[in-house]
Amino acid sequence: MSNGFKILTGHPYGILSSLSICFGPKKKKVNIAIETEGSYRKKNFLLLQRPAEYNKLFKFFSPNDLGINLNIGHLNLASRAFNFSKEKFVKMLKPYIVALELSHNNGFEDQHLPLQKGKWYWSIINDPYFAEAYKILEFR
């Protein structure tokens, strides 16, 4: 994260209207970050869960135009639901990621549990590339 991004996170439910504001806020120094989504049981109801969706999005927005809040819990759910590699997904989003939203889950429900020792996400959290990225703890 070397672009000095300030962050405003949000869910992409209103993706079309939300993305349209990305062109105006630069004048007011407002930067936009979209939170990655993910659900196992309701996977057909959410946008921006699969790599192909981000490939389409990135045709219109550069890392200077739009940031990504990578929700680790949602990534666990989406990768299970749609059978894709978490590591490849993070690599694809890496230039856009300005924040990591951190919680643990069982891969079926978004439980917002505290992080656990030795789990898959630590290599992402400890990646030097994300040293300056915001870390958001989402525990219940």
Q: What name fits each language-model region?
A:
Residues M1-G67, L77:
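Active-site acidic/histidine proton-transfer and metal-coordination neighborhood
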